[in-house]
A protein has these predicted regions:
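Hydrophobic, membrane-inserted alpha-helices
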Residues: 113-118, 133-142, 157-164, 255-263, ...
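Loop-to-transmembrane alpha-helix initiation sites
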Residues: 154, 175-180, 298-306, 328-330, ...
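A beta-strand-loop signature enriched in Asp, Gly, Thr, and Trp
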Residues: 274-325
Length: 386
């Protein structure tokens, strides 16, 4: 990388205040800091020195997402060949490559639109470019069905970045999870592209790979089958491994668990939030099962849909989640409880994780405020009793 560092140093004077390309200084700074750690340190104020900066944090999150992404690519191919009845003649390699060719365009569109808007916004405002979309750009394709068209994805990403992030002040200032804003926009603006029985399995060929399925072919997710009153055709083993229809990166509990271990080991995600989401969801699902209000076991609610993915990667978002230790327990538990309640009580919307997290994003600051005020009150009482 020394040659690249030398090249950037050589052209850097062109972007200085007196340089001919000074108008694009923010773009150069953003590209430079993305590749290299800045060589400047603060000289005033109280500073905390840590080897983990925001860029490294986001890099670790992307690494944690890779198992879900790679398995999602394979599952896209698996579902296509399974629907065509061609599993016996298909190899792992052909299914994975086919899935990758279906998923990569969505990743490219997500990053090009999102980063393009962030670069343009930073240039317009004369601000430094942040790496905030590095994580959102890869999460967004993972939480949508493979049948979602690229044009709809581009519109949704643009809406989420501008309305859900930049108008709040940019990276670190948004109150809603950007990836979930994208999904919510798609769900409410283009519902037929995000739900139903025709969006979960790719139905065309790419470079001779895959199979063209009839226009009449439909395939529901397990939660969709439950909402329709039908029996679930997937086994618990398939639910855990992820060989079921669903959003690209949300089906494999094993792949998500690997990502969870990485996030917890690096200390990036809060174990309090993550644990309380699962506990809250499991308790309410068990109650519904005991009352005979749900046709599936309580543990199947945990492994189906976007519950695991949301609990690990989105409920723990450090920007939009609760930050106090006690508040994280309340925040996570309510998310898990709400997700299951929405699933069971609203048959028209079988997946409740998105709405549960977005709803609690609004209340995360209030939860932290109440926890802090409660601690202040306790300390004041101790002081007055001395």
């Amino acid at each position: 990388m020394n040659f690249l560092r030398k090249y950037l140093n050589d052209i850097k004077p062109n972007f200085e205040p007196e340089g001919k390309l000074h108008a694009f200084r923010s773009l150069f700074d953003g590209f430079e800091t993305f590749l290299f750690v800045p060589n400047q340190t603060s000289k005033t104020g109280v500073n905390i020195h840590d080897a983990i900066d925001s860029k490294r944090i986001r890099s670790f999150v992307v690494i944690a997402l890779l198992p879900a992404l790679l398995f999602g690519m394979y599952n896209v191919g698996f579902q296509n060949y399974k629907a065509a009845g061609a599993l016996a003649d298909a190899s792992f390699f052909s299914m994975f490559i086919y899935g990758a060719l279906q998923v990569l365009p969505k990743i490219i569109v997500s990053y090009v639109v999102g980063l393009g808007i962030e670069f343009a916004w930073a240039q317009w405002k004369g601000e430094e470019i942040q790496e905030g979309f590095l994580v959102s750009g890869i999460i967004i394709p993972l939480i949508i069905p493979v049948g979602c068209p690229l044009w709809a994805l581009a519109i949704a990403v643009a809406f989420a970045v501008v309305i859900g992030k930049e108008i709040f002040g940019g990276t670190g200032m948004n109150i809603f999870n950007v990836a979930l804003i994208t999904r919510a926009f798609l769900f409410f603006s283009y519902p037929t592209k995000m739900s139903g029985d025709a969006v979960w399995v790719a139905n065309d060929t790419i470079f001779g790979l895959g199979n063209t399925l009839p226009d009449t072919f439909t395939c529901a997710t397990p939660l969709g089958e439950i909402a329709q009153g039908a029996a679930v055709n997937s086994s618990l083993c398939d639910m855990i491994t992820g060989l079921i229809p669903g959003s690209i990166g949300e089906t494999s509990v094993i792949a998500i668990a690997i990502g969870a271990v990485i996030l917890l080991w690096t200390g990036i995600a809060s174990w309090r939030t993550m644990l309380s989401v699962f506990v809250g969801g499991a308790v309410v699902a068990y109650i519904f099962e005991a009352l005979g209000m749900t046709p599936i076991a309580w543990y199947e609610h945990i492994v189906l849909g976007g519950f695991c993915f949301g609990a690990v990667f989105m409920a723990t978002d450090p920007v939009t989640s609760a930050r106090t230790q006690c508040g994280q327990f309340y925040y996570g538990a309510i998310i898990g409880i709400m997700a299951v309640i929405i699933r069971v009580m609203n048959p028209g919307y079988p997946e409740g994780m998105m709405l549960a997290i977005l709803f609690m994003n609004m209340f995360a600051p209030l939860i932290d405020y109440c926890v802090v005020q409660k601690n202040i009150t306790k300390r004041m009482k101790r002081l007055t009793n001395k």
